[in-house]
Amino acid sequence: MLEFHHMFHSYNDNPSVSDVSFSVSEGEVVTLLGPSGCGKTTLLRLAAGLERPREGEIWLDGKLVSDAGMVVAPETRGIGFMFQDYALFPNKTVRQNIAFGKGAGDHRERVEQLIAMAGIRGLEQRFPHEISGGQQQRVALVRALATQPTLLLLDEPLSHLDPELKESVRNELQKLFRETNTTALFVSHDIEDAMAMADRMVVMRDGKAEQIGTTDEVYDQPANRHVARLFGKTNFIPAGLLAEAENSFEGENGEGRVVQVWPHQWRIVEQTDGDSPVFTGKIKSVTNRGAHREVTLETEQLTLTIHLTGNVALKAGDSLSVSGDLSA
């Protein structure tokens, strides 16, 4: 459906995208994930035809639409857009906003289906300021999907929503994508959005793709420390201390290969626990995080972050032995 081949782009001789290649299959939702300035929005603009690549090619539905010498105009690509601020016209009603999309008037039956599926029936005659942020978001999505675009591009579609509303709208978006078999590429810096909505993710850093894979692959087998840290606090253990670990990656500053162990993958054990490597040390701190206790354990080899659930009667200064359960 959408293919990037060795994309390079720069602004004022400053590289913004460096040798990025990936594809989005029909009916697939892919997220470009990373911090501000990593190149993800540039890739979205390249896909839209709003920028021309310095090198590389973009193919859409089997046709070359961009390379260093040409760019097919955005309005002829059959692409739908959903902007960060939704870009609704304040002086138009919900129905008028939806109908404003090019060719939307030719898809009345689809528009009615989308209105029902998105749960905005009854809001058609209201103006944007008369509906909630979540409802505005759904109106913008219906407008983007009304013309049956080949591809939907979304730029941080959930960034303006409060946490409670965000989760609800995220679930609705995911459901609507599946029901309409939407092919989508969306930009996000939020790992929860990416994990919940995407089939695959492209993790970006400094203009390069650090890792491309399914959400499970990226979570279970991060390519490096940067990717692993996207998911929150974690532990990096020298591979030699966890000989049974199957997945490791090259560490930083010449430290050799390391294994990532999530805080929840530790279990309390006796100092001798068969063949499993045991780490023993003194507890530096215990913090109540609500659903779990976060324990900082200083061992002879390294400092560990451990999440324990249940009735944890531990305090700073206590001795503790733990073993990593990488299957947890």
Task: Briefly describe each language-model feature range.
Residues T41-L44, V139:
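ABC ATPase nucleotide-binding domain helices that frame the ATP-binding cleft
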Residues T234, A245-A328:
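Non-catalytic connector elements of ABC transporters
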Residues L33-P35:
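The feature captures the beta-strand-to-loop junction immediately N-terminal to the Walker
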Residues R54-E57, D206:
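Conserved coupling/switch loops of ABC nucleotide-binding domains, chiefly the family-specific signature
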Residues E57-R77:
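ABC ATPase NBD Q-loop/coupling interface
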Residues A48:
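Helix-to-loop junction immediately C-terminal to a conserved catalytic motif
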Residues P74, G78-G80, Q84, L88-H226:
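ABC ATPase nucleotide-binding domains
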